[in-house]
């Protein structure tokens, strides 16, 4: 009997062992076949997000019954901390949060850097300040797989965002973790709201006001029973041809101000003086038989330059190339977001859009002005024109955009040549401050306009710009100023 029991036990154990081996083998086979397929379909980020969402939902079924009035709110820097671009600011409490902007910036090799990610099930929505890539370039990540996160912004921002994301995907598709389907879902989930309109997202109330930066740009005001947060996004108090000044009177009741600091160390020259200087020097070059290349961002800077030339009835040919025509047509469809739509329409009607290589060849052969992207000469038709025009001392390259470190535009300013392998530039080189960001004095003015301010959080600036501006604010106003790193959480 004992021996029989032993044989039965051993036999049973062997059966269980081989059954387990079979199950493990089957599971391994299924994983080897289906997980790659799922990964291709969702991509790694989406697959992880989907699993995370499922786990979070299960946890939320168990943990519930929060009293919102007892919750502590926080602000977390997911991007834009002591750096320019990659803007991403999370605001919320333990029950959920919203994210203000979700953009990218680029490394030395032009690879996109993405913000930190929050648990997807926790994020109740995104609110977008404007449609520059450093504020919207990462939004589709939260549409991967089963995710359908709502996005809020002005109608102009919505339409321009679609154009910008399509172009980003076309140029950098292999370097980014989403595809066209996620861009499409982003736009399907994008809710347009007007200036002054208030929407509720979970326990927070959100409203938008003109930020004066580009058409559709917004200051974002977030209100709860605990207080008010104002996020400037990119902001400008200077009237330009394209934009009216920011409406900072609408955020005077903020308790916490999250503010950009791109030009925290610098003041901008008088805008009218810049426009006059630019026009006079363009005329000098053209009337001497030369051609002026103006590398400019397709979104806003190109339209600003074209409007300046249109206002003065520039008597020579003007060509514009790149995505600027599509953006211009969008802007003309939303004239309520423009300061001088008449000037932009005049430029659109009278200046020459480059439709192909025949037009491109004609443009650089004529004495006149060419406005072309990209603004930092990192690519686009501007590089073609630069190569054609740079060897002739009669011609000129007039920079009107911010030139980031390690870009060809910055190298031109620092070394006088396009890159380490090029010869010295023979054409005339000038730079003009057509900035659409507030300077040091204006940033201080914004802070002073807020009456019950408890703290200022500086973002979207290099460490030296943030530190310099922080010192000024402390000295002039005496309020607490924080210059956070990415990942830092601030209790409110």
From Swiss-Prot:
Keywords assigned by UniProt, alphabetized: Exonuclease, Hydrolase, Magnesium, Metal-binding, Nuclease, Zinc
CDD domains for this protein: TTHA0252-CPSF-like_MBL-fold
Entry keyword DNA repair: no
InterPro entries in the record: Beta_Casp, MBL, Metallo-B-lactamas, RibonucZ/Hydroxyglut_hydro, RMMBL
Residues annotated as binding a divalent metal cation 2: 134-135, 234, 460
Binding site for a divalent metal cation 1: 130, 132, 213, 234
Keyword Hydrolase carried by entry: yes
Pfam entry (one): Beta-Casp
GO molecular function: exonuclease activity; metal ion binding; RNA endonuclease activity
Cofactors named for this entry: Mg(2+)
Protein's job: A 5'-3' exoribonuclease, more active on 5'-monophosphorylated and 5'-hydroxylated RNA than 5'-tri-phosphorylated RNA; note there is no evidence for accumulation of 5'-monophosphorylated RNA in this organism. Translation initiation factor 2 subunit gamma but not subunit alpha protects 5'-tri-phosphorylated RNA from degradation by this enzyme.
Cited PANTHER family: CLEAVAGE AND POLYADENYLATION SPECIFICITY FACTOR FAMILY MEMBER, MRNA 3-END PROCESSING FACTOR
Family classification: Belongs to the metallo-beta-lactamase superfamily. RNA-metabolizing metallo-beta-lactamase-like family.
Protein name: RNase aCSPSF2
Record organism: Saccharolobus solfataricus (strain ATCC 35092 / DSM 1617 / JCM 11322 / P2) (Sulfolobus solfataricus)
Lineage, top ranks: Archaea, Thermoproteota, Thermoprotei, Sulfolobales, Sulfolobaceae
């Amino acid at each position: 009997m004992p021996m029989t029991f032993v044989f039965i036990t051993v036999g049973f154990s062997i059966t269980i062992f081989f059954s387990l081996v079979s199950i493990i083998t089957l599971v391994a086979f299924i994983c080897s076949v289906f997980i790659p397929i799922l990964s291709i379909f969702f991509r790694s980020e989406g697959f992880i997000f989907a699993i995370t969402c499922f786990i979070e939902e299960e946890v939320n079924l168990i943990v519930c019954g929060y009293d919102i009035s007892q919750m502590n709110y926080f602000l977390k820097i997911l991007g834009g901390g002591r750096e320019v671009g990659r803007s991403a600011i999370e605001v919320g409490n333990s029950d959920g949060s919203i994210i203000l902007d979700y953009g990218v910036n680029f490394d030395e090799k032009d690879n996109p850097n993405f913000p930190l990610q929050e648990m997807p099930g926790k994020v109740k929505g995104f609110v977008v300040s404007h449609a520059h890539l450093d504020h919207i370039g990462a939004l589709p990540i939260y549409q991967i797989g089963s995710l359908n996160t709502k996005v809020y912004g002005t109608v102009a921002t919505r339409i321009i965002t679609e154009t910008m994301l399509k172009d980003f995907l076309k140029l950098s598709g292999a370097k980014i973790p989403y595809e066209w389907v996620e861009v499409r879902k982003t736009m399907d989930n994008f809710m347009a709201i007007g200036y002054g309109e208030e929407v509720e997202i979970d326990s927070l109330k959100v409203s938008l006001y003109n930020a004066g930066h580009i058409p559709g740009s917004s200051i974002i005001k977030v209100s709860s029973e605990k207080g008010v947060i104002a996020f400037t996004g990119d902001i400008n108090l200077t009237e330009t041809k394209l934009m009216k000044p920011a409406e900072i009177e609408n955020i005077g009741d903020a308790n916490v101000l999250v503010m950009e600091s791109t030009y925290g160390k610098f003041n901008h020259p008088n805008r009218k003086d810049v426009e006059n200087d630019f026009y006079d020097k363009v005329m000098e070059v053209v009337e001497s038989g030369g051609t002026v290349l103006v590398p400019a961002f397709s979104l806003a800077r190109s339209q600003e330059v074209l409007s300046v030339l249109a206002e003065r009835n520039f008597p020579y040919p003007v060509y514009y190339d790149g995505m600027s025509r599509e953006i211009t047509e969008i802007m003309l469809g939303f004239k309520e977001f423009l300061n001088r739509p008449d000037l932009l329409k005049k430029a659109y009607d009278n200046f020459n859009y480059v439709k192909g290589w025949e037009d491109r060849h004609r443009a650089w052969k004529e004495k006149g002005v060419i406005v072309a992207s990209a603004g930092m000469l990192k690519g686009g038709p501007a590089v073609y024109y630069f190569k054609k025009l740079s060897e002739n001392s009669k011609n000129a390259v007039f920079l009107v955009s911010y030139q980031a470190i390690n870009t060809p535009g910055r190298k031109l300013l620092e070394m006088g040549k396009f890159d380490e392998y090029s010869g010295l530039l023979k054409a005339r080189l000038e730079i003009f401050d057509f900035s659409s960001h507030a300077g040091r004095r204006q940033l201080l003015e914004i802070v002073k306009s807020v009456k019950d301010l408890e703290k200022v959080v500086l973002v979207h600036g290099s460490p030296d710009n943030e530190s310099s501006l922080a010192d000024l604010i402390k000295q002039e106003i005496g309020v607490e100023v924080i210059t956070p790193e990415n990942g830092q959480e601030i209790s409110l």
